[in-house]
Amino acid sequence: MARWICFEDIELKKIRVVVVDDSALVRSLLAEIINRQKDMECVGTANDPLIAREMIRELNPDVLTLDIEMPRMDGIDFLGRLMRLRPMPVVMVSTLTERGAEITMKALELGAIDFVAKPRIGVASGLTELSDQIVEKVRIAATAHVRRAPAVPAAATPAVGGAVGGHAPVASIGRVSTEKLICIGASTGGTEAIKEILTRLPADSPGIVITQHMPPGFTTSFAARLNSLCQIAVQEAVNGERILPGHAYIAPGGKQFRVSRSGANYVALVEDGELVNRHKPSVEVLFKSVASVVGRNAYGVMLTGMGNDGAKAMREMKDAGSYNFVQDEASCIVFGMPREAILHGAADEVLPLTAIAPALIAKLSSATDRYRV
């Protein structure tokens, strides 16, 4: 006799979240936002990291939301210890200030999966407006691949012609090209993936254009951090600016970034624009413009991230003659955008993150690609 199963009666395993923040208001709001979701629950709140440490031991949560500035031990110190001793998915809750942005970049380096920018004023209304973003980032964090941080983080210091961040010395490509263009798309986990690639590219690399999903106010610090580590120059893209070899241009948060052409030069177009695939900046927007303008002189790179932003346009790039690299699942924090790019037939090579920069250099240095026009 057939037995009918009512799926509504099946209790799904909920994402267990611990909220750590020194503000009672923020703790209460975040707990309320989380508990409204059918697939997650706030199992505990703590007003400082030392209490959180005991709570993590007792409750074994799936995800931690962590404030940056707290008493007794700040969030960055706690995060560093946590990722060395008991790595777990962490979503940072950071203040939208220049200092907050710089510290957030450090948190992502230490292993935080993502961050939410809470407003300096109107916290209650601001967090309520961000509720969809908060729960989405918690869900993504719960599925992310978390890696144990090294006992002593390697200091990455730029040295022309020498090693950067512990890597082998950066090889020269041998010819500065104004025709070629490298374009990179990333989302969750992308800040560190982008750093891994850019710190391994030489000063004579072609121009590089990058879209990393990031809100306004944070890309300036991201670009400045990369610029201090790389042999190439790294900056936020500026509307109308010529795209130069040996330079990387990052889409400003909250703007759409395209590549255009003016005579023999590639030019950055930065504008407000509409959300595309729910994102601004959107990888789809950048890659579609590269397919149209750069064609077979483009090299595409799709890195870790949730969703499908950029997958269709990366296939358009391939159809226009580009050569595309996609990060493999094992090295991704979230294997969403790379998976979609592969499913769309956009990948020429699927590689571990650490292999992408050497493969790019080899491709750019090869005789067949050096004179590809």
UniProtKB/Swiss-Prot annotation:
InterPro entries linked to this entry: CheB-like, CheB_C, CheY-like_superfamily, Sig_transdc_resp-reg_Me-estase, Sig_transdc_resp-reg_receiver
SUPFAM superfamilies: CheY-like (SSF52172), Methylesterase CheB, C-terminal domain (SSF52738)
Any one GO MF annotation of this record: protein-glutamate methylesterase activity
Catalytic activity annotation: [protein]-L-glutamate 5-O-methyl ester + H2O = L-glutamyl-[protein] + methanol + H(+); L-glutaminyl-[protein] + H2O = L-glutamyl-[protein] + NH4(+)
Modified-residue entries (4-aspartylphosphate), positions: D67
GO biological process: chemotaxis
Cellular localization per UniProt: Cytoplasm
Entry keyword annotation includes Phosphoprotein: yes
EC number: 3.1.1.61, 3.5.1.44
GO cellular component, one term: cytoplasm
Domain Response regulatory as annotated: residue spans: 16-133
NCBIfam families cross-referenced by the UniProt entry: PRK00742.1 (NF001965), PRK12555.1 (NF009206)
Family statement drawn from the similarity comment of this UniProt entry: Belongs to the CheB family.
Entry function: Involved in chemotaxis. Part of a chemotaxis signal transduction system that modulates chemotaxis in response to various stimuli. Catalyzes the demethylation of specific methylglutamate residues introduced into the chemoreceptors (methyl-accepting chemotaxis proteins or MCP) by CheR. Also mediates the irreversible deamidation of specific glutamine residues to glutamic acid.
Domain description: Contains a C-terminal catalytic domain, and an N-terminal region which modulates catalytic activity.
Protein name in UniProt: Protein-glutamate methylesterase/protein-glutamine glutaminase 1
Source species of the chain: Albidiferax ferrireducens (strain ATCC BAA-621 / DSM 15236 / T118) (Rhodoferax ferrireducens)
